[in-house]
Each structure stands twice: as structure tokens, then as C-alpha cells.
Amino acid sequence: MVDTKTPGDKTLSMPTKTLTLKPRVEQGVVRQSFSHGRSKQVVVEKRGKRRVGGDGPAEPAAAAPEVVKKPTPAPPAVSPRQQPRPSPQQQARSGMVLRTLTEDERSARATALADARVREVEERRLAEIEAQRRAAQELVDKAEREAAEVRRKAEEERHRHEEETKRKAETEAKKRFGEAEPAKKPADGRPASTSTTTTAPRAPVTTTTRPPAVAAEAGDDDEAPRMVRRGPGGGPARPAPPPKQPAAKPGASKQRGRLTLVTALTADDVRERSIASFRRRTQRLKGHASNEPKEKLVREVIVPEAISIQELANRMSERAVDVIRMLMKQGAMHKINDVIDADTAQLIAEELGHTVKRVAASDVEEGLFDVVDNSTDTEPRSPVVTVMGHVDHGKTSLLDALRHANVVSGEAGGITQHIGAYQVTSPETGTKITFIDTPGHAAFTAMRARGAKVTDIVILVVAADDGVMPQTVEAINHAKAAGVPIIVAINKIDKPDAKPERVRTELLQYNVQVESLGGDVVDVEVSAKNKTNLDKLLEMIALQAELLDLKTNESRPAEGTVIEAKLDRGRGPVATVLVQRGTLKVGDIIVAGAEMGRVRALISDQGDNVDFAGPSVPVEVLGFNGPPEAGDRLAVVENEARARQVTSYRAHQKREKAASIVGMRGSLEQMMSQLKTTGRKDFPLIVKADVQGSLEAILGSLEKLGTDEVAARILHAGVGGISESDVTLAEGFSAVILGFSVRANKEAAAAAKRNGIEIRYYNIIYDLVDDVKKAMSGLLAPTLRETMLGNAQILEIFNISKVGKVAGCRVTDGTVERGANVRLIRDNVVVHEGKLSTLKRFKDEVKEVQSGQECGMAFENYTDMRAGDVIECYRVETIQRSL
């Protein structure tokens, strides 16, 4: 065989031993023993160092610590070994024949060399990465060893602290209860000198007595057992045999605890008492201490209007069963969740030795109103004057003359239907007077009552030509109920038929005695049209206010009364408020009835925006969440939380009141049965008004129209424009929508036209009430009136083949008409009622027969007639009723 290799050619040769990665983890098994003969086998892994290289000699053991302390530098890159080029003599001796390489062989060798260089670069890169990884791993191992040492020291410190605590507790218990137990033996039967074994643990295996690799990996697993050090020959580590466990003594405490690195390395030591054992001992000591008599705790128990037994027991720090036992002694059987009243709760709490503080849900309103002011902080304020009287007696005209305004021309129908508040400055004294104008119509009783409540003085306007009228008497009663003085203004004295003296005399009937007749009521004759004696009227008002000595504190939080409220489309809920005490400012948090809000703007009676309003100043307030009720009291609170408490309580009261009214009406079945028996008809209505006062007056007037046969049923009533939801509600109940000084929006009008719902608009309350009255009158059943025509007596009965039985009669009185209603009376008993179908005189049909004449009669669908019967003839008239 001829060798084709060229002598002296450089060939690529690989090392005799391939480059491999040996497993760096050696495993061993060690058995750990626990209390009560329990044991556990734990697999211990020993991680060795990963080495990259050939068959170089092993590193000496002395250099091992160096590896732990600093990272091993990267080994040199492994390069393929090259064979030395043989000399020409060697080639001659070998007998090889050399020849020149072909082009293909050269290219193949070049490719192999290039691949070898690429592999060399890749192996060098991998070696560098491995060196970096080993360095990082060594840093992590070092940190874990340090952390394990810190945990071991902390565990030893905790054991020492627990032993010291137990020793102190045992000493204290012996002092208190005089236990006869020897001091050397604690309560669990173990020797008292266990502190020597717990405080001086066995020296742990140091890293100098075993290879660093094992020490570095010891912190990787807390469950790893101890390893036997490696022998001189450097053999693999073998697990140490498990230590022998002493026999468990009867009565010994259970040795339970968490397995940590320290406990695993010191498994052959005597283990200390567990935490659970210490807790049980503490509980026993507490049980002994509980036998001592305890001092009774007396608490102040807050008792609301209703409280459950469980809550009462919690507030008294008593057991609920004790409270139930006391209730059983009083003859009341209750469960733990039952609710008892405040009186019963107070009796139980006082019997148990506690003090009781009674509270109510209405306590949230304490401090809102009627807070007494310091007399040193009060200042004089303007008087509030309410103008009252009968309709068309000139109340608004008198106010216009005082204000130099013209409000009457803007009123619909020339009558006042809204309550208004204005402020007038006296030209002589310069003092300001607040006037409140009230409607005089009978429907606005509530408005007049509100005006009398918030006023200081009442001006009773009486027309000199009309005298005292019903609403005049009502105004007098309102003023007397409010306890305010009256000034009588006799108006329209410029008329020819004016009789002021007659007015003064008529007032005497209602206990109003003017000064000219020896009384104490001031009267002034005025003319609003000619502005006569207006200065005298203002002078009397100022004099009366001076006698009242009106003072208030302006620097306190504001209080007032809502005179009127409405829902403005552009501004939202708007309330006309008369400030009575304090100063109302923009930004204040206010509460009125069940509504709250923050003052966004204040508008005076002249239409100007103001920043604040003092006492006796009427303003429009913007910023409520919803329109309050007219007559609600307004107050400023400190924060929104308090405002929410007050409004939620008032809303709850309002719901309860509405529910009680519904409950009084009875159940649905009772209402339906009552409807069937009485036959009462309802007229469904939806009412929308511009302000609360007008809505209140309309509802009151409609309620008065109801009778036992027909009544107005208000499906919905509110303030604001007519919306599409109102039309939808009206469609469901076939109701009529009434709008007072409001209009329907575009969508609502289109929906009403599409569904055939009638919407009626009114500006005068008289017209609204009259139209509803006429519509309700149409639901009334008409009245039937009988008109007697005459009587006839049957003389003989004839049988006619074509007609049947015909009674031959004589008319005794009156007349008998054909087609009239008749009654057949036999022995003074009505036996038949019907109509007269046939009336003949001789053989002719006639319309009527006069008294004294004879005729023939036949009834519709009745033939049982006898001689001697009496026939009554009468006519029924239908009369339409009205309310």
C-alpha cells in the first residue's frame, strides 16, 4: 500500500482525549431523626467545580481555598495539537512517496483549517462565558453562606431569649401560686439546666476541615445533612450515619418545629421545647390567673331608639346570653338578633351597673337652628313686613307704590300668584324694610301661612269700598297664630264709595280694635293709586320695629326660610330665601329640608349678583341639588358630611311619612273592593308648575273638588317644564297634563301629539280649577227626576187577537201619554214598571187622554193585567250634575 500523504505536510490533529463536561453534582443520602422515633431520609447533593481542559494534572488541594476566595481565571483556549513535521531523513526511512496535492485537496484542507479556526474562536468564547458564570456562582455561594451564618446566630439568640422568658415565667408563677416543685425541675419534667445545652450549641462543621466545594454548597439546601470529610485519597464524600435518638420519655413535651439549617446540622443535640408547648404553658398560667376575682368594668353605653341584643351586649362588654337571661327573668323571650326599644335597653344596662346615654336619630339636627346668640354680639336688623289681605284689595299695588315699581302689570290676570320678597329704603329715616307680598286667593292659604311665620309685622290691607272679606279673616288668624303685631292699611280711600269707618267697625268682630276706637292696633288710610299717606305707613312700620327691638348676630352661620322654590331650565334649582340670622355667603354648604348644596350664586331682589346676604335680606340661592320645599328652614353647616347626615335623616323621615299614609289607605285589595262598592271614578292628572308654592296651591284646590263619586287622581306633580317622561306616564293612564306657567319641550310636545295626549297650559289658577271642575262634572252620573202625569183605573180586560190583552181604563186624574213610563199597582203594591206601548180612544191611536175619559192601554212585554189595578203614568227627566 502506498501512502499518498506528501512528506512534510502539516495536518490537523485532535488531542488524544475529547473535551467533555463531567457532572458537577455528587449525591449522597443521610437520615435525620426527630422526636417520637420519626426519621427522614434526605438526599444531599455535592456540587463540584466544572473544569475545562485536557489531561493536565489535578490541582493541588492546598490551592482549594484560593478558589473560594477569588474567581478562577479563564483557562487558555484549547487548541488542536499539531504533529511535528518529519525530516527528509525520516521520510526516506519510512519509505513514503511524496507527491504534490491537487487543487481539490488544497481547497479541502483550507476549508478544514478555516473550520478549525472558527471552532477555536467559539470554544474560547464559551470558555470565557463559563468562567464568568463560575465567578458569579461563587459570589452567590458566598452570599448564601453569610446569610446562613446570620440565620444561625439569629436562631441561637431567639432560643436564648425564649429560655430566659420561660425561666422568668416559671419564677413568677412559683412566687404567685407557691408551687412546691423543686427549682431544678420546670413544669414539663425536663432538667432545669437545659439552658446549658441550648445556649451552647455544638460547634458547626467549619469550612477548613472539609473541601470548600462542600462548604460552598452547604447553604443551598437547609435540609442537607452533614457530610463526612473526604479522606486523604480524595475519595467522594459519604453521608454520615444518622445519630441515635434517645428513647422518648413518658410525659416529655412534643418536639415539633421547623427544620432549618441549624437544626439539620445539630440533629444529634438535645432539642429544646417547641413554641406550641410554651403557648400551652402560658395558657395554663392564664387559667390560674383567671380564678382571681376581676374588677367590674363600668362603661357609658350609648343607647339609640332601637338596638339589637347583640349590639347592646357588645357596647356593655357583656355576654349576649347574660342579656337574654335578664330579659327572660322579665318575662320576655328574645333571640340574639332581636331588636329591643331604648327603655328596655336602658333597664338592662343600669341593672348590669353601666351608665346609659340616650340618643335619637334626630340628634343630627341638634345645633342647626335656634342657637342662642351672645347679647354683646347682636346688632339691630331690618324689620320683615308681610302684606296680607283679600284678593283685589290692592296689596301688590301698595307695594309697587312703596318700591316705585310696577309688578302688577307683569302678573297674569292682574292677580298675584307667587310669593315675592322685596327690600325698600325709607326716604326719611334711611332704614331698610323687607316686604313679603302674599297672594290673596283662597287657594294660597299655605303661602299666607308661610309669610306670617317669617315676618315681624303684618300689614293687613282692607279695601275701603269692599270691607272685611273671607281672606281678610284668614290673614287675621294667621297673624294671631304667629304672634306678630298688625298694622291695618285701609286702601282705596280715593274711591267715592269708600267707607273707612265701616272697615274699622267690621274689624271689631274679629278682635281687631284700632287706636281710633280705643285699641292698640295702628291703622292708616292710604291710596296706592294716588300714593296717599305712604310716608305715614312707613313711619308706623319703623315705629313698630323700634318697639320690637329687633337684633341679631351677623357674624354667625346663616339661618333662613325658603319662601319659594322652583326648577329653572337654565340655572337649575333656585330657592328664594329670607335670611333671618347670620350672613349667607357664596361657597357656604347649606341644608334645606331634604336637599343640600353649595351656594354658587346669590341674586338680590333687584337682579344683581351679590357675594353675601345679611339678616332680613331676601335673595335667590343657586346651588341646591334639587328644589327644596317651600317653607323649609335653611341652615349653613360646617362640612358636606354633616349635610349628608341631616339630609339622609330627613329623607328617611319623609319616606316613613309617605309609607304611613299609604298604609292608612289600606291594601290594594281593600282599595279595589272599596272602588267596586262605592263606584268612585278617578280623573287622572299630571300637574307641572313653575314654583313650589303654585304647585301646592293647585294640588290643594284639586283635592277640594273631590266627592264620593268622583275625585282628581294626581299621578305626578312637580316643578319644572313638561318632559317626555310625563307624556309617557300620561299615555299609560290616559291622563291629562296640566302645565301652570310652564311649557313642554320639543320632544314632549311631539310625543304628546303622536300619542294623542292632551296638554293644557294655564297662567291663572282660577281657569285651571274651573276647567278641571267641568271635566270632573262630566264623570258624574246624571240625576233622574220623575214628573207625575196622571192615574188611571182598569175597568175591564179585552183579548184582541192581533194586539193581545188590552186594558179598558178610565183616567181618574191628570193625563196619560203614549210612550210614557207607567207603574202597575195592585193592592198598593207595584207589580210592574215599564212603558205604555198602546193608547187608544175608541179605535183611534191618540197621544194623550185627559182626565175623566176612557181609553184602552197596552204595556210593552207585559200582559198580566187585572180589573181593579191602578196605572200611574209619569215622565223621567235627566238632569246633568256639576261639582
Curated annotation (Swiss-Prot):
Residues 132-188 have a biased composition (Basic and acidic residues). GTP binds at residues 389-396, 437-441, 491-494. The keyword Protein biosynthesis applies. InterPro entries: EF-G-like_DII, EFTu-like_2, IF2_assoc_dom_bac, IF2_II, IF2_N, P-loop_NTPase, Small_GTP-bd, T_Tr_GTP-bd_dom. Residues 389-396 are annotated as: G1. PROSITE patterns: G_TR_2, IF2. Keywords: Cytoplasm, GTP-binding, Initiation factor, Nucleotide-binding, Protein biosynthesis. It comes from the Bacteria. Residues 72-87 have a biased composition (Pro residues). Residues 380-551 form the tr-type G domain. Pfam families: EF-G_D2, GTP_EFTU, GTP_EFTU_D2, IF-2, IF2_assoc, IF2_N. GO terms for molecular function: GTP binding; GTPase activity; guanosine tetraphosphate binding; translation initiation factor activity. Residues 414-418 are annotated as: G2. Residues 57-66, 191-217 have a biased composition (Low complexity). Its main location: cytoplasm. Residues 1-96, 132-259 are annotated as: Disordered. PANTHER family: TR-TYPE G DOMAIN-CONTAINING PROTEIN, TRANSLATION INITIATION FACTOR IF-2-RELATED. This is Translation initiation factor IF-2.
